[in-house]
């Protein structure tokens, strides 16, 4: 059993002001517990999991999570209403508090499976998928989408897509990555950077449809920018910034709750009970420490902290003492800075 650090602000709620985007190869269960330590009120999302994998795959590996992660949402991939409904029902049985349908991933592999961003061209099908899931679960069923695909420059088409989706589910929530998705010519990484951001479209959507809960994603790299967006929309979803500089999650969470900031080292040490349980279960440290690399981003000693974890984490016998070794470098730097 995974120990619980602090459940005071846990539980399933309708607060979508801060969330962490579903990111393939990043937001696994170990990353999500770390993010929960940093941001007690944030909504967390899994990596995308295809509906067929949920139905036929290793559910413990794909769906297992610690109770402290709540509220946590499962992001599903797929385009077959019946399969998505079956997968959603399984996910709710596993305790997920939200089901999110991926309509934004532009990768070739996802396109070959006829889901992800290409679904934005089929709003009626997306509505059928959402309705099928909403009919069999009691938790919110939401969608994460782009503004359009390829050279679409039609706000009306985007708004129509949202209308189709929102009418299919009682949750009335949409997550929008404020860029188009290019289905040819760009890699997934380039698709997160090259298509221009159009925050004005997302603001307009919220202004014209005030009954919708609109969450904005894309290009948010600071707490200040996120708070500015919250003047216009209901929530912000952080992606790469939350992984590359995870302390931003703590800063944002504290800004929303008017709580004092805690030192990075204190937050990291709060993760120790979880790490020790995972190690006892046979996990190697390298699967965990890769999510910690950015915690001291831009801080004195931050680069060496990462190097120690990277190199030492490869050892099969590495344990929490490696993290303490890396932290000692940071604390030595802080002591030196205080003296001089």
Curated annotation (Swiss-Prot):
Q: What keywords were assigned to this record?
A: Flavoprotein, FMN, NADP, Oxidoreductase, RNA-binding, tRNA processing, tRNA-binding
Instruction: List residue numbers at the site (Interacts with tRNA).
Output: 102, 189, 192, 303, 306
Instruction: Reply yes or no: does the keyword Transit peptide apply.
Output: no
Instruction: Name the Gene3D superfamilies for this protein.
Output: 1.20.120.1460, Aldolase class I
| Class in the EC hierarchy, top level | oxidoreductase
The GO terms describing molecular function are: flavin adenine dinucleotide binding; FMN binding; tRNA binding; tRNA-dihydrouridine20 synthase activity; tRNA-dihydrouridine20a synthase activity
Q: For this UniProt entry, which residues form the secretion signal?
A: none
SUPFAM superfamilies, per the entry: FMN-linked oxidoreductases
Q: Which residues bind FMN?
A: 22-24, 75, 144, 177, 217-219, 239-240
Q: What is its EC number?
A: 1.3.1.-, 1.3.1.91
Instruction: Note one Pfam family from the annotation.
Output: Dus
Which residues participate directly in catalysis? Answer: 105 (proton donor)
Which InterPro entries does this entry report, sorted A to Z? Answer: Aldolase_TIM, DUS-like_FMN-bd, DUS_fam, DusA, tRNA_hU_synthase_CS
Please list the cofactors this protein needs: FMN
- Disulfide-bonded cysteines: none
Report the domain of life of the source organism: Bacteria
Per its record, the protein catalyses: 5,6-dihydrouridine(20) in tRNA + NADP(+) = uridine(20) in tRNA + NADPH + H(+); 5,6-dihydrouridine(20) in tRNA + NAD(+) = uridine(20) in tRNA + NADH + H(+); 5,6-dihydrouridine(20a) in tRNA + NADP(+) = uridine(20a) in tRNA + NADPH + H(+); 5,6-dihydrouridine(20a) in tRNA + NAD(+) = uridine(20a) in tRNA + NADH + H(+)
Biological role stated in the UniProt entry = Catalyzes the synthesis of 5,6-dihydrouridine (D), a modified base found in the D-loop of most tRNAs, via the reduction of the C5-C6 double bond in target uridines. Specifically modifies U20 and U20a in tRNAs.
Q: Which family does it belong to?
A: Belongs to the Dus family. DusA subfamily.
Write down what this protein is called. Answer: tRNA-dihydrouridine(20/20a) synthase
Organism of derivation = Xylella fastidiosa (strain 9a5c)
